[in-house]
Curated annotation (Swiss-Prot):
Residues that bind ATP: 46, 53-55, 99, 102, 107
Name of protein: Succinate--CoA ligase [ADP-forming] subunit beta
Organism field: Aliivibrio salmonicida (strain LFI1238)
Gene this protein is translated from: sucC
Catalysed conversion reaction: succinate + ATP + CoA = succinyl-CoA + ADP + phosphate; GTP + succinate + CoA = succinyl-CoA + GDP + phosphate
Alphabetical list of InterPro entries matching this protein: ATP-grasp, ATP-grasp_succ-CoA_synth-type, ATP_grasp_subdomain_1, Succ-CoA_synthase_bsu_CS, SUCC_ACL_C, Succ_CoA_ligase-like_bsu, Succinyl-CoA_synth-like
């Protein structure tokens, strides 16, 4: 689950990290009043969406007057912001963040992720702030400095000092950086974060550090024990089908193709998408119904796939291990009867109760195309999507 910038900064402030004075606003009038409370001559106003590239897309502006801030809010609230990280539709803007402008002398980068190789939280810092860190990692990886956090003792001050020295910080700036580093390290563990990023972490003209931006991603598997963060969830930033799928514990990701895929197991789902591509098709989604799929969940999965108007055919690829193929068949039959499927459906069942599942499908009287191998299933669904 992602947080908005203003939400990330709220958490930063709770841990004593320096953030600009700012206010999240739902209306243009609120933005106007917020600008009046900010003492700096210039005000920054930012669209709040779960996507990067806001500045280049016109979603971040600097204004001298309260009226300018209000006009910006009127322009964007209720509209969609399209950036290089969104689809053509963009993300809806329901809030804008109005905050004080900062005198920036230097921009740094500070972030943290869970490193699966070392099984530790790893901090990354760089003097190249304000730019795409992936690009820096690819072109000049020597500019990225790392510190791995021992889970037994947590973040240590000496690690913060080492990073500060490598970033060229001096004097009181080192103390400020260590405080930020320790705060972020503790916050990362306490809130079950998967990713944390401050880009840029700026050095102001006065020589102080300031968290000018904030990006936080929370481990969805830990949301059950993070009620505070659950309240920060913004469903407007998610694909409606993905949000609906999550309610049924289905792993669904919308894509741009025309062949709907329903598979059990993430690895098999990716392999299915690959072989569909190999035979000239384009998957419309990734959908893993999981090992504990029930008839109801399969029916719901089918509904979600068919709610995409781009879907021209559906491929169901099930390997029965924990899940029984006959239950999958019941779900397919129920969904087809309930929804009234107008597109071809290709089904490949293997494993636990596969013969019984195939028998149920054959006796249903529905227009379902059977396949006995993954290659055959891919060939048939691609042909069906093309109307052959």
């Amino acid at each position: 689950m992602n947080l908005h910038e203003y939400q990330a900064k709220q958490l930063f402030a709770e841990y004593g990290l320096p953030v600009p004075e700012g206010y999240a606003c739902d209306t243009a009038q609120e933005a106007f009043e917020a600008a009046g409370r900010i003492s700096t001559a210039k005000k920054v106003v930012k669209c709040q969406v779960h996507a990067g590239g806001r500045g280049k897309a016109g979603g971040v502006e600097l204004h001298d007057t309260k009226e300018g801030v209000k006009e910006f809010a009127q322009k964007w609230l209720g509209k969609n912001l399209v950036t290089f990280q969104t689809d053509a539709k963009g993300q809806p803007v329901t809030k804008v963040l109005v905050e004080e402008a900062s005198n920036i002398a230097n921009e740094l980068y500070l972030g943290a992720v869970v490193d699966r190789a070392t099984r530790r939280i790893v901090f990354m810092a760089s003097t190249e702030g304000g730019v795409d860190i992936e690009k820096i990692a690819e072109e000049t990886p020597e500019l990225i400095h790392q510190a791995a956090i021992d889970p037994l003792v947590g973040p240590q001050a000496f690690q913060g000092r080492e990073l500060a020295f490598k970033l060229g910080l001096e004097g009181d700036q080192i103390k400020q950086f260590v405080k930020i580093f320790l705060g972020l390290g503790n916050m990362f563990a306490q809130y079950d974060l998967a990713l944390l990023e401050i880009n840029p972490l700026v050095v102001t003209a006065e020589g102080n550090l300031l968290c000018l931006d904030g990006k936080i991603n929370i481990d969805s598997n830990a949301m059950y024990r993070q009620p505070k963060l659950r309240e920060m969830h913004d469903p407007s930033q998610e694909d409606e089908r993905e949000a609906h799928a999550a309610q049924w514990e289905l792993n669904y990701v919308a894509l741009d193709g025309s062949i709907g895929c329903m598979v059990n197991g993430a690895g098999l789902a990716m392999g299915t998408m690959d072989i569909v591509n190999l035979h000239g098709g384009q998957p419309a989604n990734f959908l893993d119904v999981g090992g504990g799929a029930t008839k109801e969940r399969v029916t719901e999965a089918f509904k979600i796939i068919l709610s995409d108007s781009n879907v021209k055919a559906v491929l169901v690829n099930i390997f029965g291990g924990i899940v029984r193929c006959d239950l999958i068949a019941d779900g397919i039959i129920g969904a087809v009867e309930e929804v009234g499927v107008k597109v071809p459906v290709v089904v490949r069942l293997e494993g636990n109760n596969a013969p019984l599942g195939s028998q149920k499908l054959a006796e249903s009287g529905l227009n379902i195309i059977a396949a006995t191998s993954l290659t055959e299933a891919a060939e048939k669904v691609v042909a069906a999507a093309e109307g052959k």
